[in-house]
Amino acid sequence: MSSRNASIANERTDEARMFNFYEKMPKDTNTVRVFDRGEFYVAIGEDASFVAQNAYHTTSVLKHHNVSNTSYCNLSPSLFIKFAEDVLSNLAKRVEIWGANSAKTGFELLKQASPGNMQMLEDLLVSENYQESTAISDSSVSSVLLAVTTRVKQDQRIIGVAFIDPILKKLGVSEFVDSDAYTNFEALIVQVGAKECIISQSGHESTNGNSAVSINTAEINRLRNIIEGCGALVTTIRSSEFSARDVELELSKVLDSPVTHALVPELGLQLAMASCNALLRYLGPALLNPDMEDDRENTSRKLHLYHHNLEQYMRLDIAAVRSLNLLPPPNGNAHKTMSLYGLLNHCRTAMGARNLRRWIVQPLLDAKSIERRHDLVSALVEDAEARQLLLDDDHLLRSIPDIPKLCRRLTRGSASLEDVVRIYQMAKALPKIVTVLDSLTSEHKDLVDKVYTNVLNNHCKNLEKLIELVETTIDLEALDSHQYIIRAEFDEELLDLRQRLDELQHSIFEEHKRVGSDLHQDTEKKLHLEQHHLYGWCLRLTRTEAGCLRGRSSHYTELSTQKNGVYFTTKRLHSLNNSYMDHQKSYRYHQNGLAREVIKIAATYGPPLEAIGQVIAHLDVILSFAHASTVAVIPYVRPNIVDSSIAQEKHGQSSNILDIVSLEDTPNFEEIRRTLENNHCARLYLKQARHPCLEAQDDVKFIPNDVNLEHGSSELLIITGPNMGGKSTYIRQVGVITVMAQIGCPVPCEVADLDIIDAILARVGASDSQLKGISTFMAEMLETATILRAATPRSLIIIDELGRGTSTTDGFGLAWAITEHIVTQIGCFCLFATHYHEMTKLSEEITTVKNLHVTAYVGDSESKDVALLYNVCEGASDRSFGIHVAKLAHFPPKIIEMASNKAAELEAEDSGAQGDTQEVKSKKEGMAIVRDIMRQWRSNVKPEMTQQQMMDQFQKVIGSFAQQINSNNWLQSRVSTNEVSS
């Protein structure tokens, strides 16, 4: 057997072994497995189908193994990287790479990654998607990993949480009391953007000091349901991992400061520390920095621990995030205008885009912090020239790399000279950015200087030595040819090697000319000198011209014949090439050593670089707000934040717990929350409000409407009107505008007066959960119950079409009771869109309930054409438009006619229920008489009777009921003794 045949046979044997191995692997729907085959990857079975649908978007790529008939498909390395990033970032699944073991007798797990733990694939993903300045997408979201445990003691449910953001190098902990619906935990998942959550495999003992409290499996299942509902991946680990024992030792390995109870008060949060221990153990001893064990003194590699306070941000449940379209869907296929994030994302840096996403799910509660953001936005709105320079100049924000990810590469030891050059280019761009900011003439110039200009100026000075280092060591002229190399003049030995390489290259060029003269071939057009990836320096002639080599094998050695010509060399060129390759190898080796030293020095600039990244990310979002406000169909306006109740006199020092670390003072959030909870919202007034996403869509002319919610007069608005008339849009735009105002963005209104809202809770749309055994109605009730428990007097509740999943009477009764409870017991602002017109009667009983309706024009009685006007007016809707909407949807005329007739019949019955007319009453009595006649006749008829005898018997019964028949008008007009006898 030839070596080629043997190789093919071995490959087939290995392939069969791979398919057999896959069949025996345990199935996991949350994991995608691929096999590394060297030059490509292979997905098998269900994983192949998943790859075909999500990577290729077609099943035509599926093949079938000729022995097992199992489906499979191949992926190139570049396609696999894109696919893996999508799976980890958007599809909430794990990725495993399997390959042949060292003995080549089986397969082993080579690498694995999950949405919250990408460390094994991180370098691969970053290197493939390195152009951060242009790759601003949802894939730039931080892969936040969270661990959670809980205990119930004295009827209080306490949650302990720890989470890590590897990009920002932050380790957050939190411990709080929650309801049995886990509303606070859900809000925290939304706030931190957790992609993966670690829970116990089963109920476990949670340590709190010296006591242990049992946690039953039901609590674990509730946590799982909340996590999965938020779109995060659930990972289970042994319950014994959730222990606070030795947590100080574990933290000392990864934190950037000493770990003692005096310096780290978070150690007193026992449940949070138990979750923290589980988190650290899951990630492994070296955490996200593999070399940390060898460099414990390097604090730039370590994490910053902070206490995440739920009280600092508006609470948003996942239903509100989705129903208000605050973020794009996980698949990322939606148009930019389909979500608030997409609409506002004009960021020029990846870290700015991440910061924007964080701000949207973390609206502020402190009025001063909100006003500060609006001041900064106003400064850029007022100066169009400066704004456009920052947006469009390729040498300003567009030249800033993804600094957190770049710093992470530096600290991991996986950086390159290209990374150092990008830092250098950023350092050169900073003074230009400062110059533009310094040119602003706004009344808020002092604030701009405090937040941006002065800070960036200081950091520019810190980077002067780094700029000098790069200009001294790196060949900047070579950047034009995309080469990142050390300057030969920087090192004497390197310079000697460079000079020798230049001499060899000159000799090679001379040999090229000599061969051209010898073969009588033009060295510019026919005889080509090339650096081949296999042969190094060699010569090439087209196959047409290669005839001149025949009979001259003693002078010229043919290397190969290919489509583009014949490759050959000479003895001298071969010798020169070998010498060149040896010197080049020495040059690269020596240069790599110098490059490592340069990179190591650059890595020491981690802290100032990270601080610059925070400032630039903040500026990028503020700039994005200003740009979105000015390019909108109708420019946005600055809202007036009505500070009705928040006490702001006492402010603490900055403690790095805000997303804009050290850029804004940190208010006393506990005081703010207490004040919020004890006070009602004063007002939410929007004049000519518009939905920002809808008005930005093509071919949409949006009809603006006013919104007026005021404590003591109009706290709950009931909106009725035709389907497709704009009810849902009206109530959702209020939620979106509220979020925009509290993140510091101007809003799409003419005038906006808003008090601080502490939570937006939404119950919008029907959502069957049949896979979980939950019906539409049950889902409605569960969501509504959660809202009622979580709402405070300062919340905003948005309810759309509650009670459709059950009978009309039950649905109406529940809707009435729920609405009445909200307005009388909770007292918060609420927008309630409903198809139950009877709900409008609630305003007659409760003065703070107001009725609104969306208008429609109805034609004359013959045409009955309907035109939806989308205006929201005071008062209740006086009719239903369901059949008219069916006409707009082009239902068959026969169905429309049947629906109209049935509606008329039901209306008649309904009016009868309200108070029967004489005709309807006569009909009911007549029908009862007929039933009595038939009942008596049947009892008198015998089986042996003839037909005539039966008719005679019927006449007798009719005669006995003659008085009742004659006294009933409806029966008398339809039945007579003569008609019956005939």
Curated annotation (Swiss-Prot):
SUPFAM superfamilies recorded: DNA repair protein MutS, domain III, P-loop containing nucleoside triphosphate hydrolases
Localisation per UniProt entry: Nucleus
Major subcellular site: nucleus
Residues the entry annotates as binding ATP: G721, P722, N723, M724, G725, G726, K727, S728
Pfam families: MutS_I, MutS_II, MutS_III, MutS_IV, MutS_V
Family membership: Belongs to the DNA mismatch repair MutS family.
Name of the protein in its database record: DNA mismatch repair protein msh2
Lineage start: Eukaryota, Fungi, Dikarya, Ascomycota, Taphrinomycotina
